[in-house]
Amino acid sequence: ALLTLIITLGRRFISQRNVNQQNTLNFAAHSVNVLDNVLLPLEKGRNPLLALVGAPCSQAHLVLRKQAASLQTVRSIALVKDGILYCSSIFGNRDVPLREIQPALPSAETKLVLSTDKSLLKGSPILIQWYPVSDSGEDGVMQIVNIDLITRLMLEPQRPLITDVALTVGE
């Protein structure tokens, strides 16, 4: 009787472990799809935004606001010229050295940066998509994604088994 109990429990343990492993793999695939679905519209809408870099904020601000409103996961969009954040979809005209609020930016390469908000909802987690315009990387477009919404979308299908998500970006 004891041997039967041990064998039954062992088989049940292995079976449940396999189910949990499959659920984890399914969740990982779902998470990648969610992130792709969030980032793809940013990439598709970047060319009109790149053309705005260098334009006066009075001309670009309305376009930035409309673009940010059309992308549900975007918190804000900002234009950077010569390393200075000069126009934001939320604040309008600005004059802030980008390195002061985001030390990893500007960059000569397209970057995805996980950071914390230092302007609007201070301390809240954000995901920044940076698109440089110039070879020096000092000019570009910064799109700030609301990461709280991304994690909710990732946890959407199966909350009971997986209750928390850790997102690692970069190195």
Residue spans of the language-model regions?
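Residue-identity detector for glycine
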Residues: G10, G45, G54, G83, ...
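Solvent-exposed, extracytoplasmic
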Residues: A60-L71, Q102-G170
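N-terminal short leaders/motifs
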Residues: N18-V34, K81-I84, L153-T168
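A broad, low-specificity signal for short, low-complexity segments enriched in glycine/proline
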Residues: I7-G10, D36-P41, S89-L105, S124-Y131
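Juxtamembrane extracytoplasmic/periplasmic/luminal helical "stalk" adjacent to the first N-terminal
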Residues: L2-A55
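Extracytoplasmic/periplasmic sensory segments of membrane signal-transduction proteins
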Residues: V38-R99, A108
